Amino acid sequence: MARKPDISAVPVESAACQGPDPRRWWGLVVILAAQLLVVLDGTVVNIALPSVQRDLGMSDTSRQWVITAYTLAFGGLLLLGGRVADAFGRRRIFAVGILGFGLASLLGGAAPDPGTLFLARALQGVFAAALAPAALALINTLFTEPGERGKAFGVYGAVSGGGAAVGLLAGGLLTEYLDWRWCLYVNAPVALLALLGCRLLPRDRRTGRAVRLDLPGTLLGCGGLVAIVYAFAEAESGWGDPLVVRLLVLGVLMLVAFALVERRVQDPLLPPGVVAHRVRGGSFLVVGLPQIGLFGLFLFLTYYLQGILDYSPVLTGVAFLPLGLGIAVGSSLIAARLLPRTRPRTLIVGALLAAAAGMALLTRLEPDTPQVYLTHLLPAQILIGLGIGCMMMPAMHTATARVAPHEAGAAAAVVNSAQQVGGALGVALLNTVSTGATAAYLADHGTSPAATVDGTVHGYTVAIAFAVGVLLLTAVLAWVLIDSRTEAADETGSASVTPARPR
């Protein structure tokens, strides 16, 4: 007998227009402003992190929480955010998300200590998880004509894709010419303008369907992920440390309980059928696992460029542009043309191998490598960017193919959650690998200034080598799980479902 979910509510939907809303394009501007905040804050603090660490006195072990707190809260609550928007109204939750995001940004900018900053970043992630799915749903409501809706989603995708690059540049400019705190303060005026613009969005109206919020599933799923990430962050003291072992066991048990709960509740947060399918489950892994290396790479290269090569924050942001450009070109130009002619598995595996080759090039970094940007960093970023970009489109295609219409939103949300959660796990794990390798190097070679620099770079390269292994493992999983026979069945069985809003 199915157990009753925790909370049910009469859902509130945005009122559909009788004809095209004359203010729809202005409404899209409001939505895009909010989405830019969400995407930009995933990278804007990266460039400022060395300055943040010095100013607030963070340890090398704890610095990763500036990134992880945001991505973990965002990814872990994204599925719930869609349900909350359904229950209480998309425009209302969108406005609450913007307001909360702006206030959390002010709190982070004024943070007097690391703990306050970590809390603010987590709150940013919570409110981002509320407004992001509401934004997608509002675009569906605003644009009823298929042609206009396609254009709107195209612009939305461009902002989502370009926001990361904008964040890197903005982080460099704000840190160098103002202060790292402005990387967070800058969100407040944008959030205020978007909040005032909410009146341009469709009003919410009630419907007769009941929407149930799976709070036990949310608590178990997010709690399990937090425990595992915390264990990774504390593993510098050794994987056999009692605290680390307890956290890992707790995290695994909570995730097992989450899986059991999702099989029993009437309206699960994550429908088991979405992830039980072999190709879809493999695709979610393919989307999430590479983020371990990608997010870690942002962290280590930022410190390498500023701390070892003495790049300014602005120059650091510019130095990252080839990576973002490679992802955009790989996804929108190369993969878009190859996917109709190439099996997704073939394209995914080839792209992952290219990204692994680029990452492997970075394992040869040294403190005094001549012309290191031209000989190592630039070609590596191009390979990684093109590889990740060419991998994402076919992986998203197979992740959402043949999904039941009522589960399409959940499948799309899992794709987004996998990226954020993979990044959170990656930053925590690779930061621990790096600091552990550095500590071991210094124990063997002493702590002279030269040895400290060498040990720091050694830690980066060991962590990057670990990321290479993750990419190769992902390629193997893609080859095994996304098999040609199942792909053929998917392609002939039904058309793929376009990723919908998270539910």
Curated annotation (Swiss-Prot):
Pfam families: MFS_1 (PF07690)
A GO BP entry: antibiotic biosynthetic process
Membrane topology: Multi-pass membrane protein
Extracellular topological domain residue ranges: 46-64, 114-122, 174-181, 234-241, 302-313, 368-371, 444-461
Parts of the chain on the Cytoplasmic side: 1-24, 86-92, 144-152, 203-212, 263-280, 335-346, 393-422, 483-503
PROSITE patterns according to UniProt: MFS
Taxonomic superkingdom: Bacteria
Protein localization: Cell membrane
InterPro entries: MFS, MFS_dom, MFS_trans_sf, Sugar_transporter_CS
TM region(s), chain numbering: 25-45, 65-85, 93-113, 123-143, 153-173, 182-202, 213-233, 242-262, 281-301, 314-334, 347-367, 372-392, 423-443, 462-482
Record flagged with keyword Transport: yes
CDD domains: MFS_MMR_MDR_like
Major location category of this protein: membrane
Family: Belongs to the major facilitator superfamily. EmrB family.
Full protein name: Puromycin resistance protein pur8
